[in-house]
UniProtKB/Swiss-Prot annotation:
GO terms for cellular component: cytosolic large ribosomal subunit. Keywords: Ribonucleoprotein, Ribosomal protein, RNA-binding, rRNA-binding. The gene is rplR. SUPFAM superfamilies: Translational machinery components. This is Large ribosomal subunit protein uL18. Part of the 50S ribosomal subunit; part of the 5S rRNA/L5/L18/L25 subcomplex. Contacts the 5S and 23S rRNAs. It holds the Pfam family Ribosomal_L18p.
Amino acid sequence: MSNVNSRLRRARKTRAKIAELKAIRLSVHRSNCHIYAQIIAETGDKVLASASTLEVEVRKDIKNGGNIAAAALVGKRIAEKAKAAGITTVAFDRSGYKYHGRIKALADAAREHGLSF
């Protein structure tokens, strides 16, 4: 089984567990150049808030979108947008990625700015 298939299998299992809980989830996706975060409704059909390194406000503060500092900034922005939408508690969906590096930085920044999971 390839690394990509293993990651996708882990992501499927995590999403199934979160769906059982009927919880709002913070879903994270990363590429080599950017990182994306979305807060998705319990039913999984609606995005309540989103942030990424492609946003104009984020791009003017960072030089490179594929590093830990950029991930921390996205974590801060998603937490602020979630609070503005009245969301304080989410389930963290790391999409099968290791909880390390950019994923960890995003999660820690979101927690620091008021999001609990």
